[in-house]
């Protein structure tokens, strides 16, 4: 559904050269045109408008001086830097244009009719006047010569036994004679010049020759291969014309045929059989076809026609028509009229071999015209709310309009057709009213069609794919308002212009147009502002007058208008973009500037250009024919095949067969560039896959439809997720819930978006939502899709972050909140109509309220539905069975203890009555409480079952106690009985025994104690070491003193095992009355002062000499050994860490990936403990047996959990060293209180030297560690491992090593090792008396 649009014309008038032009060729590398005349060759530069070279063939004797000579062909030879020329007299001349040297490389005595080079310029084919073909090499050596007329069909002759042919068919009463009709041959057309025509296939493997048969006088087409072997001869086609063109893609050979009432362009296959045709818009004998030409990519067929002279016709014209095909229909896209006399008479025309859309035309008056055509889609602007998404397709004198908002009609069909008197060259829609159309035809008239409420159909408007008897048109069709003729300033200038004087006709407002014309004398363009003016003589004929004109330096190749900003962007051939200010009092142009104030210039000329606002900035978007996409002067992508701007969205299709949609309102240039160039992965809302080769036709405004066209011509409608969600959000903002719901249901958008888009607004308008939907099925569908997930954060995040809304439900129970709100609204509106939806609201809650649902169904039973909208109990129950599993529903009904409800549910289910009736009958015979107990136990509702069973009486207590033990219901059971009851006593004892089995001795003791089971409580407290409670129980049991003393010694032993020496000493002193053993336990636990208190309390000063002082001195020695060991370990690890860091900074990090980052091999290495075992410092009464040995076991357990090894050269040795150093510092830090305590008793017993020695050693160790901490835990050292090394001095290896190093960064679990340990400087551990 594309049209051909003229982007640029290049014209060179009045070329100063001798003679009259006869033919021409293109010199692509030089950018010049070589024209042949009866005098010689002339090379012109159409851009600079100058004659570069003139070569006379008359002076060399190749052409006669009387001007009767003729050049039949010119071919530029690229690799030889020369030109091959053939004359009608038979000379084949090679001409070096730069040196003007001529060389005759061959001569045909009989003369040459046609010269044709193969596409690869390896073979030369000459048709002579003696009806022969001569094939030569590129070196002009004759390969072979054959007669044009061949009796044989060719190598591709069909082999058949005749089945299905005319010879074997029955012909009715006429008999057999009709089977063999007389072959009738029509002679060639009267205007046929009888010259042979030669055309090559695009790959140069075959060529076809059209020649007038010497026997029949009719034209035939013969196909030869590259080896000059005849392949096939065409079937006899009456009225076959001389024109011949082989499609470069190789599928068809085009020619013409005169039929009794029409003239067709027909197509032959390589085997000579006809394969399709299309009819030219002329009557028989009205025109003749001079030539057919395919463009380079086989997409356009140019037909050069000329009026045949008739009586009474003084003005004859010639036409160049451009035809394209789609969906097997041929469209006439352009019709360019030329004169057949004077300077505008066409001599020859050629398609450019490099640029597919460039057509070169040579006219008789030494005029050269070059037209660049590009594909465009003429669609409505889509800016107004009532825009119908019209797309107009040019087809000769018809404009095929498809209204995509109402129907998707595949081409070549359409919604309606506009009939124009002359072939259409351009169609445009109004920038403000997209349904209004203006059509420019080949006679430079503009037909304006407007859509209004007129009931009558216009005679020039015909319905297309719709219609019929009684059919009512569901849309407003346009009517012809008036036709306007563009008025020129000079009548002579009007007759002496190129066929398309005005280009880029743009309808900017109701009565104003913009158009572009070019200057013939200089590279300038003129922007015309055209306004409508009525005609006094004819109401149906108006005029377009030029109200103002602005001259622009440069060739304009693009013009677009933005209706929102009323800005017009003008693109020049050099890529510069200008802004045309047509609303200003004096029309002017200025450079289009970007946000930085720099003029915008495309790097390459763009064939499609549009203006749009991106993030509030007005930008120009351009797409080149090489798929490069620009926004202002920035190339954002190089794989874009088509794009369209609709509302606030930019849609593009790419070479990777995707369609991407971007919101422009909150977008930026960098974001679009990142999304299009693939530097960031587009979200699912932005990107969707499309069929290979899809191109955007249009986007339906205020809708979700995106129309794509496939390469073969068929259409596909897709609903791009971004467009869908944007439209749904608009509907929800306007409280148009029904439209949003229908769209979401049809396109399978999660219905949670209705609430999540704006929860507060939805909950405030629940009644509006229900009234608009007004369908029980649709409401139920909405309920079934509800979930706690916020889809605006997961599935459908908004393109622009919206303002944070206060949560309407801080507990996160979204589903419950919606169900409750909608249920209240439905019960208010019409509870009978929405009965099923109300039931669904109960079922869909987080905890389904099946009991309430069953109760409501039970209430419906027995009611007669008088109202038509009411629902019976049976219908409600059937519906519930769709939502809930039948077994679950049966169980819930059983849990209501209502057997009528249970039977109703069971009857509607698939259950066998033999299964449930005996069970229900058994239950009915039971006592009420026991019945409910049995039901709850069956339903595994054990707490309720226990409650009912406890009410059944003492005779059921044994069963009750078994239930309590089986289901661990002790806490619930204790709430059901009085504390003074025997049942409470029995449950408590069972509970305590259960806790003992679980090794929870202290809670078990408390339970036993509360219920009076003191002996069991004593055992439990004794097992857990709770000596206070154990002694309390002993008192309540009134135990004898000796038993109490034995109990105390047992408790003391357990406390010692738990390293609670002070508490063990208290028990021995107060309950076992053994103060001596108590003192020894205190000395073992380093409680020096408490031990002295007992010594003096019981006046046993002798113990000081025998036990206290030796223990103190032993402890001091152990402390000194421990400090020496830890200091040496600290220094050794610190020095090794320094070495490790130096090696790490020196060695390359290229192979770091091969290291074991997670310590998988560390189990193979031996671990080195940094703390000595307690046995090295043990003494009989020293604290090392308790505290230091406990620390050693703790370190061993920690070492077992460590992943890092201290072995030299291990992968993470540095981290292991940090861990070891941190442990040393922490162990020293924890000794401060202990050192302070022993310093006091050392001073007390006059061991001042030992005390000072210990104090100095401890202070020295602390200073050593405090000084080394900043060097060990350095900030730069930690950052260097994770910061990539970048910069001008970096290399590939260094950058890779830096990034690979980040892979081995410290795991989260080991991050504590990178933090320096804390040393409390405020701790007062010193003894000032020793200083």
UniProtKB/Swiss-Prot annotation:
Residues 884-1331 are annotated as: Mediates dimerization. Component of the elongator complex which is required for multiple tRNA modifications, including mcm5U (5-methoxycarbonylmethyl uridine), mcm5s2U (5-methoxycarbonylmethyl-2-thiouridine), and ncm5U (5-carbamoylmethyl uridine). The elongator complex catalyzes formation of carboxymethyluridine in the wobble base at position 34 in tRNAs. Regulates the migration and branching of projection neurons in the developing cerebral cortex, through a process depending on alpha-tubulin acetylation. ELP1 binds to tRNA, mediating interaction of the elongator complex with tRNA. Residues 1193-1205 have a biased composition (Basic residues). The modification Phosphoserine is found at residues 803, 1170, 1173. Belongs to the ELP1/IKA1 family. The keyword Phosphoprotein applies. It holds the Pfam family TPR_ELP1. GO terms for biological process: tRNA wobble base 5-methoxycarbonylmethyl-2-thiouridinylation; tRNA wobble uridine modification. This is Elongator complex protein 1. GO terms for molecular function: ATP binding; protein kinase activity; tRNA binding. Gene3D superfamilies: YVTN repeat-like/Quinoprotein amine dehydrogenase (2.130.10.10). Phosphorylated. It comes from the Eukaryota. Its main location: cytoplasm. Residues 1167-1207 are annotated as: Disordered. It is found in: Cytoplasm; Nucleus. PANTHER family: ELONGATOR COMPLEX PROTEIN 1.
């Amino acid at each position: 559904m594309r049209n051909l649009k003229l982007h640029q014309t290049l014209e060179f008038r009045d070329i100063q050269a001798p003679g009259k032009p006869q033919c021409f060729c293109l010199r692509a590398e030089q950018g010049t045109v070589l024209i042949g005349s009866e005098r010689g060759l002339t090379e012109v530069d159409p851009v600079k408008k100058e004659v570069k070279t003139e070569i006379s063939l008359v002076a060399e004797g190749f052409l006669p001086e009387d001007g009767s000579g003729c050049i039949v062909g010119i071919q530029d030879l690229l690799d030889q830097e020369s030109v091959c020329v053939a004359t009608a007299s038979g000379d084949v001349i090679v001409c070096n244009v730069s040196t003007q040297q001529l060389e005759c490389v061959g001569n045909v005595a009989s003369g040459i009719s046609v010269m044709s080079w193969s596409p690869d310029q390896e073979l030369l084919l000459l048709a002579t006047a003696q009806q022969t073909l001569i094939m030569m090499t590129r070196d002009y050596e004759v390969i072979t010569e054959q007669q044009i007329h061949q009796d044989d069909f060719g190598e591709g002759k069909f082999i058949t036994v005749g089945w299905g042919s005319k010879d074997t068919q029955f012909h009715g009463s006429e008999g057999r004679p009709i089977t063999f009709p007389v072959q009738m041959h029509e002679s060639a057309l009267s205007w046929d010049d009888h010259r042979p025509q030669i055309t090559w296939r695009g790959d140069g493997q075959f060529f076809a020759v059209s020649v007038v048969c010497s026997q029949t006088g009719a034209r035939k087409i013969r196909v030869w291969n590259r080896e000059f072997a005849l392949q096939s001869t065409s079937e006899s086609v009456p009225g076959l014309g001389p024109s011949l063109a082989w499609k470069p893609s190789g599928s068809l050979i085009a020619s013409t045929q005169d039929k009794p009432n029409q003239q067709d362009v027909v197509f032959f296959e390589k085997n000579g059989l006809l394969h399709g045709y299309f009819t030219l818009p002329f009557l028989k004998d009205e025109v003749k076809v001079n030539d057919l030409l395919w463009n380079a990519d086989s997409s356009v067929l140019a037909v050069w026609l000329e009026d045949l002279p008739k009586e009474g016709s003084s003005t004859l014209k010639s036409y160049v028509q451009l035809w394209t095909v789609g969906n097997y229909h041929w469209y006439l896209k352009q019709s360019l009229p030329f004169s057949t006399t004077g300077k505008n008479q066409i001599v020859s025309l050629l398609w450019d071999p490099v640029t597919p859309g460039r057509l070169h035309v040579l006219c008789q008056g030494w005029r050269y015209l070059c037209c660049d055509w590009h594909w465009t889609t003429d669609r409505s602007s889509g800016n107004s709310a009532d825009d119908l998404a019209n797309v107009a397709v040019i087809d000769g004198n018809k404009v095929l309009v498809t209204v995509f908002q109402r129907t998707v009609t595949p081409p070549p069909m359409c919604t309606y057709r506009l009939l124009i008197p002359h072939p259409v060259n351009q169609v445009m829609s109004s920038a403000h009213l997209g349904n209004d159309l203006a059509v420019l035809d080949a006679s430079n008239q503009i037909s304006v069609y407007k859509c209004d409420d007129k009931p009558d159909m216009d005679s020039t408007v015909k319905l297309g794919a719709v219609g019929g008897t009684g059919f009512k048109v569901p849309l407003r069709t346009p009517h012809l308002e008036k036709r306007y003729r563009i008025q020129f300033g000079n009548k002579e200038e009007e007759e002496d212009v190129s066929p398309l004087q005005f280009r880029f006709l743009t309808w900017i407002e109701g009565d104003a147009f913009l158009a572009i014309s070019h200057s013939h004398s200089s590279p300038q363009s003129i922007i015309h502002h055209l306004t409508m003016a009525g005609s006094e003589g004819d109401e149906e004929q108006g005029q377009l007058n030029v109200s103002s004109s602005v001259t622009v330096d440069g060739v304009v190749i693009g013009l677009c208008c933005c209706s929102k900003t009323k800005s017009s962007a003008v693109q020049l051939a050099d890529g510069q973009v200008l802004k045309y200010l047509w609303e200003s009092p004096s029309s002017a142009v200025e450079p289009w500037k970007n946000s930085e104030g720099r003029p915008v210039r495309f790097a390459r000329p763009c064939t499609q250009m549009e203006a749009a606002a991106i993030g509030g900035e007005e930008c120009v978007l351009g797409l080149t024919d090489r798929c490069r996409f620009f926004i202002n002067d920035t190339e954002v992508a190089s794989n874009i095949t088509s794009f369209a701007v609709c509302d606030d969205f930019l849609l593009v299709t790419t070479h990777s067969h995707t369609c991407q949609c971007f919101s422009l309102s909150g977008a930026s240039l960098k974001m679009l560039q990142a999304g299009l160039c693939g530097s960031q992965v587009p979200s699912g809302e932005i990107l969707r896959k499309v069929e290979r080769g899809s191109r955007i036709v249009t986007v339906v405004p205020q809708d979700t439809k995106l129309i794509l066209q496939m390469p073969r011509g068929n259409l596909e409608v897709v609903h791009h997720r971004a467009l869908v969600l944007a439209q749904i959000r608009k509907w929800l903002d306007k409280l148009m819930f029904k439209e949003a719901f229908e769209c979401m249901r049809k396109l399978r958008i999660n219905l949670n978006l209705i609430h999540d888009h704006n929860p507060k607004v939805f909950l405030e308008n629940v009644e509006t939502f229900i009234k608009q939907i007004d369908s029980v099925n649709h409401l139920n569908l909405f309920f079934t899709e509800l979930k706690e997930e916020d889809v605006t954060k997961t599935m459908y995040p908004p393109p622009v972050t919206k303002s944070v809304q206060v949560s309407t439900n801080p507990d996160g129970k979204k589903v419950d909140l919606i169900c409750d709100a909608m249920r209240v609204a439905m019960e208010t509106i019409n509870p009978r109509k929405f009965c099923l939806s109300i039931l669904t609201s109960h079922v869909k809650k987080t905890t389904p309220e099946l009991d309430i649902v069953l109760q409501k169904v039970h209430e419906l039973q027995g009611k007669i539905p008088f109202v038509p909208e009411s629902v019976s109990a049976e219908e409600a129950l059937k519906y519930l069975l769709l939502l809930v599993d039948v077994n679950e529903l049966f169980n819930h009904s059983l849990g209501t203890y209502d057997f009528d409800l249970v039977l109703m549910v069971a009857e509607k289910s698939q259950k066998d009555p033999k299964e449930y009736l005996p069970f229900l009958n058994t239950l009915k015979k039971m006592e009420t409480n026991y019945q409910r107990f049995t039901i709850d136990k069956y339903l595994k509702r054990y707490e309720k079952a226990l409650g009912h069973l406890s009410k059944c009486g003492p005779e059921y207590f044994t069963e009750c106690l078994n239930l309590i033990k089986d289901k661990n219901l002790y806490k619930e059971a204790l709430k059901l009985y009085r504390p003074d009851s025997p049942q409470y006593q029995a449950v408590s004892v069972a509970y305590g025994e259960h806790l003992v089995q679980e090794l929870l001795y202290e809670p078990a003791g408390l339970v036993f104690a509360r219920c009076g089971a003191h002996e069991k409580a004593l055992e439990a407290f004794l097992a857990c070491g709770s000596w206070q409670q154990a002694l309390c129980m002993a008192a309540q049991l009134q135990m004898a003193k000796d038993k109490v003393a034995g109990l105390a010694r047992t408790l003391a032993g357990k406390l010692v095992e738990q390293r609670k020496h002070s508490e063990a000493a208290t028990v021995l002193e107060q309950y076992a009355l053994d103060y001596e053993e108590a003192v020894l336990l205190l000395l073992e636990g380093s409680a020096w002062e408490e031990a002295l208190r007992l010594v003096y309390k019981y006046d046993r000063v002798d113990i000081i000499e025998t036990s206290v002082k030796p223990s103190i001195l032993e402890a001091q020695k152990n402390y000194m050994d421990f400090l020496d060991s830890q200091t040496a370990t600290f220094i050794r690890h610190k020095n090794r860490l320094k070495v490790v860091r130096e090696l790490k900074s020196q060695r390359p990090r290229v192979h770091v990936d091969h290291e074991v980052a997670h310590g998988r091999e560390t189990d193979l290495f031996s671990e080195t403990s940094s703390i000595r075992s307690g046995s090295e410092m043990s003494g009989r009464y020293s604290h090392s047996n308790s505290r230091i040995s406990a620390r050693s076991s703790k370190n061993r357990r920690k070492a077992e959990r460590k992943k890092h090894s201290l072995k030299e050269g291990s992968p993470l040795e540095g981290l292991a060293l940090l861990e070891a150093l941190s442990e040393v510092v922490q162990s020293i830090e924890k000794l401060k209180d202990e050192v302070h305590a022993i310093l006091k008793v050392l001073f007390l017993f006059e061991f001042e030297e030992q005390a000072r020695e210990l104090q100095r050693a401890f202070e020295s160790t602390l200073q050593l560690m405090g000084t080394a901490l900043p060097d060990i835990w350095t900030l730069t050292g930690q950052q260097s491992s994770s910061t990539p090394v970048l910069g001008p001095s970096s290399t590939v290896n260094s950058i890779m090593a830096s990034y690979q190093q980040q892979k081995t960064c410290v795991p989260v679990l080991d991050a504590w090792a990178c933090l320096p340990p804390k040393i409390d400087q405020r701790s007062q551990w010193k003894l000032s008396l020793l200083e």
